[in-house]
Amino acid sequence: MIEEAPIILCGFPSPAEDYREDVLDFNSYLDISRPSVYALRAKGFSMTGAGILPEDIVIVDKSKEAINGSLVVAAIDGYFTLKRLLIGKTIILHPENPDYEDIHLSSLEELTIFGVVTAIVRKL
């Protein structure tokens, strides 16, 4: 927990620069104290268009309902992936990088949605 999170302007100085926020609790801010929320480390480049880079920490909530357009952690026949869920006449797991192809799910494949991405954490 960070005891104090001062506000710092990235533009012109402000007379309000000495204003300070209350305690910044990342557990509360990212809503990670609930048992349905977990963190995963991203690997690969298929989701760079969604702002997810290798080594990012992806916060996932198992209790959220995945809807069309959600970023989801899914398992296809037991293999895990993070993609954008597109629901239409068929279900597509869409990578957010043009160098990667969509995953079109057939009726023979077993899809399990493990959770919806709610936040990304990245070190600079």
Model regions and ranges:
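Flexible glycine-rich active-site/ligand-binding loops centered on an Asp-His dyad
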Residues: 110-111
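Structural motif
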Residues: 55-56, 70
